[in-house]
Amino acid sequence: MQVLPPSSTGGPSRLFIMRPVATTLLMVAILLAGIIGYRALPVSALPEVDYPTIQVVTLYPGASPDVMTSAVTAPLERQFGQMSGLKQMSSQSSGGASVITLQFQLTLPLDVAEQEVQAAINAATNLLPSDLPNPPVYSKVNPADPPIMTLAVTSTAMPMTQVEDMVETRVAQKISQISGVGLVTLSGGQRPAVRVKLNAQAIAALGLTSETVRTAITGANVNSAKGSLDGPSRAVTLSANDQMQSAEEYRQLIIAYQNGAPIRLGDVATVEQGAENSWLGAWANKEQAIVMNVQRQPGANIISTADSIRQMLPQLTESLPKSVKVTVLSDRTTNIRASVDDTQFELMMAIALVVMIIYLFLRNIPATIIPGVAVPLSLIGTFAVMVFLDFSINNLTLMALTIATGFVVDDAIVVIENISRYIEKGEKPLAAALKGAGEIGFTIISLTFSLIAVLIPLLFMGDIVGRLFREFAITLAVAILISAVVSLTLTPMMCARMLSQESLRKQNRFSRASEKMFDRIIAAYGQGLAKVLNHPWLTLSVALSTLLLSVLLWVFIPKGFFPVQDNGIIQGTLQAPQSSSFANMAQRQRQVADVILQDPAVQSLTSFVGVDGTNPSLNSARLQINLKPLEERDDRVQKVIARLQTAVDKVPGVDLFLQPTQDLTIDTQVSRTQYQFTLQATSLDALSTWVPQLMEKLQQLPQLSDVSSDWQDKGLVAYVNVDRDSASRLGISMADVDNALYNAFGQRLISTIYTQANQYRVVLEHNTENTPGLAALDTIRLTSSDGGVVPLSSIAKIEQRFAPLSINHLDQFPVTTISFNVPDNYSLGDAVQAIMDTEKTLNLPVDITTQFQGSTLAFQSALGSTVWLIVAAVVAMYIVLGILYESFIHPITILSTLPTAGVGALLALMIAGSELDVIAIIGIILLIGIVKKNAIMMIDFALAAEREQGMSPRDAIYQACLLRFRPILMTTLAALLGALPLMLSTGVGAELRRPLGIGMVGGLIVSQVLTLFTTPVIYLLFDRLALWTKSRFARHEEEA
């Protein structure tokens, strides 16, 4: 058998082979830079994704959902709708709260979006109610970056109002000052206030009204500038006792005189220190608490930030009263640490397996040491580049490095194997290194750039998924590029110094046995290849069959978006009858908490009741269930959810919706389940007609579970139907009626108490303890034009009606969100298709539109772009290979290996019961870059044999296949073993890593078996095609 002639120049490696000291120092510099970079990199669960979302919250205590919509939400929406770069605007108007969520284009800087939002709020100020307690407040919201830590502050002795004040002025501020902390938000609604509860009978007996009391309080408590005196010799600042600070001072306030005797506020009202909003509450386990959610600054190291918070907690606790306790309810870094540690372990295991497979093939310790140095050097050097690119150590970048283990060793293996071949033939190590490195240099460059070309389309994905995987793709590309540099510099230099004929020929019993085994395998392969080359059309039919099979598998495989992770935290929504009060809901919440805390997997529970920026109505409650670490519980999160829902089903009058929290969260609003589908109309009446019909259909679908809707139109309303004629005769306006009702039942904030540390409100309301329900309306009194007191019942009738508990808009039109989960035996793709089919059967009118939201919308977008992404990767690789080979034909031969990888990956996913999700698709794209390596190594040597030895194409490709069989097998097994730890992972975050490993292992196994035989056949086929084309052109030229 003829041997391919090596190059004698050494190519780009010559300088580094001849200067070992310089090469060594260069590699040491790369190593040190990587170590320094590793220590400087922040740690997070996923790459930093700037999601330009701003939330505008406006509180108007006492306002109904209808009033909030028309008076607050609509004016703001009209202004926001004129902003450039706005992608979507959604709003939720409920009792006393308006929440508008503005989602901007990913390309718009968040600072610019903030400026536009502030300008829009300023423009809408004159259109908002004049008695709005506070202007709209906006805040940056990043759904992809949830709180890193949740703390609960409880006390066995202090009132919760004092605890809230202490937390707001002392604890939260201290935590906010920690480096890396971005925002600290409080839940629990126990801000201190002076509450004035009017006795309706007492003020009526004295001929007073609530408006009289409100005016008196407002005028008695002011805080304004008074000026100063500037005399000839001294200046004096003016001050006065215009502020009342305590409930006792308010009790003594004179609100009127009767028969010359003063009437004090304490005579007609109960004045006490209380909470600003008595319809808000938070609980930690079974204790009422103030809950703090801590979010990090963008780019901050989540691990060091959490450690700093924990280090400060003992110091903070010592400064608080002994009865106050600060408890860590949840800490995301616990799971992040575990996930990152598991991924780092899998990375080390991949390195160990790759080195083991190298030794198995080379059977030589010096030859094994060389790639054993090249692999960690390439990976560690990548950290230095990651620092300059502002990347982080996260699950995706570590996955990229784990996969890169199998990639980066390929280059070193190819170089070592080629150099070793020349040494075994009798060449001196230095000469062999020069010849072997020079001969293989173009192959290394081809392998490197064609593999990087596969990753290029990932960089141009414009959606949130593209932003997420940008770090993955660049990290992998950098590792591959450094690997190529190391393989062309350090590897041949070490081969020249460490390898020799004696070391390569030195064999033990294992070496001799394995050598014979490999010789038999190569001989068997040679015989099989000869038979395949004699029956090319049969082999070609097999190749075409794999292409057809890959298309069929792609169509029928279950499809998903992102693997459901077990992060140890469950979000829940508790739903009660629509007429439930705060007290009733709080009681139900405590019953549910008792049931949940009995589960052996639950560590702690946080719950919240009341209307605020995230909770839409009094009949719902938010829950956060913190599970024990994965190693301390028997079941994963999905089984725990099923068990908890079964247990809570026994609690009457409530529905519980649970979903595991995810590292990747795209939804901009609090949802009951993982996936959302919206129904939008031009009016609420249209929604009330079609939502029940669609819900009935969807609840019958086996592809969906936990189907629910935020459409709640059975909220009780006491409609005050005023006889306007009668009211007019008495000189009573509708504004007087509204003011009287607001004073009595709106928890009206009528004044502000200013202190050195904080500001507190004075709250006015009627004392309804003795007159609960609708009977309280009979106590309302108004003042007529002649000063008389008129009962509300004399000019109005009270009608009980139903109305929505909240009014939701999407881009200024009414909308309803239908939430759903997907059962274990179905995929998200099945659910989406079932919903779309059901929608068609309803024949919805043209004024009703439907759309998926959040993760489901992202799934549709990712699914639609996946095919184009793969096509782009193939085209990019064809262009690079065409440029490198200066040929239109050879790149097609190389790319013919791709269908085999697709078949293997899709079959492996189906056998493992995994969906074709974003992670698996990334694995398939990487396979495109890996499997073509086999063809490149074959074709490079075949072309060289034809060019330099004058061999026929059949002899050249046959010899190339036999010569490159061992490095092909080594590189494929190295890539396979690099992905194997990901496929077998079982720890925290394994759900994210496993699909990538499964797809890559399956694709590599199938492609390895098939491409060793199909590639030579296709090479010869295209060679004949090229000859036929040339002969045709030659004939045409002769005829011309």
Curated annotation (Swiss-Prot):
Keywords on record: Cell inner membrane, Cell membrane, Membrane, Transmembrane, Transmembrane helix, Transport
Membrane topology according to the record: Multi-pass membrane protein
UniProt cross-references to InterPro entries, sorted A to Z: AcrB_DN_DC_subdom (IPR027463), Acrflvin-R (IPR001036), Multidrug-R_MdtB (IPR022831)
GO molecular function: xenobiotic transmembrane transporter activity
One GO cellular component, as annotated: plasma membrane
Protein's cellular compartments: Cell inner membrane
Pfam families noted in UniProt: ACR_tran
Induction, as annotated: The mdtABC operon is transcriptionally activated by BaeR.
Membrane-spanning intervals of the chain: 16-36, 347-367, 369-389, 396-416, 440-460, 472-492, 537-557, 863-883, 888-908, 911-931, 968-988, 998-1018
Main localization (coarse): membrane
Family to which the UniProt record says this protein belongs: Belongs to the resistance-nodulation-cell division (RND) (TC 2.A.6) family. MdtB subfamily.
Quaternary structure and interacting proteins, as annotated: Part of a tripartite efflux system composed of MdtA, MdtB and MdtC. MdtB forms a heteromultimer with MdtC.
Purpose: The MdtABC tripartite complex confers resistance against novobiocin and deoxycholate.
Protein name: Multidrug resistance protein MdtB
Gene: mdtB
